[in-house]
A protein has these predicted regions:
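C-terminal/domain-terminus segments
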Residues: 50-55, 198, 273-282
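PAPS-dependent sulfotransferase catalytic domain
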Residues: 81-82, 87-221, 231-244, 250
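PAPS-dependent sulfotransferase catalytic core
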Residues: 1-78, 123-135, 232-247, 251
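C-terminal accessory extensions appended to soluble enzyme cores
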Residues: 249-282
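Short, flexible helix/strand-to-coil boundary loops that buttress conserved ligand/catalytic motifs
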Residues: 46, 117-118, 260
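Residue-level detector of family-conserved "landmark" positions at structurally sensitive sites
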Residues: 46-47, 220-222
Length: 282
């Protein structure tokens, strides 16, 4: 199917105005922001403004006709239910962010997600994995006892790995992706969207997402590349180097073969510990 849906949550219901777009970084959250942002009744904030707005330190300007306001916040994916929400290397902290809103949770295969972490490079030409992924994992291990206890086996595998960078990336993906199944178990109003299904069967998947938000279908979401989008850089790109003029396609599916040594795959899958199959089954 490509999507998975849970209940209405501990507080509030699906008729709430706000919703959140979350998921492991490099899993397609920006694409989902662009797609839903073209819906006539939706306004979406990207990361450049979403975190500040939710922390109460940034201005929030929403068109009067908007029925749903989306916040793309992948940094906070695994921390939505925390009393204080923050992320390593990010200056913004917020309290009591989640109040029962609908959640759109992007899910992408382990290997392609990690490949995208390697593919994306910043101004220094360092990969996203080395700029953010590895330091974040080390921070979790050293400063988050809950993480260290929960993933003790996986941390040991990472420390012993022949390909430690890729093993760390797998652990990063594991922690972020585990949050979907945790939220689902709690009965929160979360819909899981597999990136691979979204790009291969966009209309059927997007109809499920739009319905989850309690909105009528708008065919405009199928042609986001023809729309003007807010929060686009001077270079014409959205967060993470996403080109808003690129139509939905499957070019990034199975890209991992260009970036990941086959000898590293078994180590990565051992850390994922069956989660790859659970995601693929959605």
């Amino acid at each position: 199917m490509g999507i998975g849906v849970a209940g209405k949550g501990r507080e509030g219901s699906l008729d709430r105005q706000r919703f959140f777009i979350v998921g492991c970084q490099r899993s397609g959250t920006t694409l989902m922001r662009l797609l839903l942002g073209t819906h006539r009744d939706v306004h979406c904030f990207d990361e450049a403004t979403a975190y500040a707005i939710l922390a109460g330190v940034g201005p929030e300007e929403v068109p009067a006709e908007t029925l749903r306001v989306g916040y793309k916040i992948p940094r906070w994916t695994n921390a939505l239910l925390d009393a204080e929400v923050t992320d390593f290397g990010h200056p913004i902290r917020a309290t009591d962010v989640y109040r029962g809103e609908a959640i759109v949770f992007m899910l992408r295969g382990l290997l392609d997600t990690v490949a995208s972490m390697i593919k994306l490079r910043g101004r220094s030409q360092q990969t996203w994995l080395h700029t953010w992924g590895l330091p974040t994992v080390e921070h979790w291990i050293g400063h988050d006892k809950r993480f260290a206890d929960t993933y003790a086996r996986e941390i040991a595998l990472f420390r012993a790995a022949a390909h430690p960078d890729l093993a760390a990336a797998a652990l990063y993906w594991r922690h972020k992706t585990d949050a979907y199944f945790h939220y689902q178990h709690l009965g929160l109003p979360v819909i899981g969207v597999r990136y691979e299904a979204l790009v291969s069967r966009p209309e059927s998947v997007l109809r499920g997402v739009v319905g989850h938000l309690g909105l009528d279908w708008d065919p405009a979401v199928m042609a986001h590349e023809r729309s003007d989008h807010p929060q686009i850089s001077k270079a014409g790109l959205a967060t993470g180097g996403t080109d808003p003029t690129r139509a939905i396609d499957i070019r990034s599916v199975d890209q991992w073969r260009e970036f990941i040594e086959p000898s590293a795959v078994d180590e990565m899958l051992a850390i994922a510990d069956g989660l790859v199959e659970r995601v693929a089954a959605l």
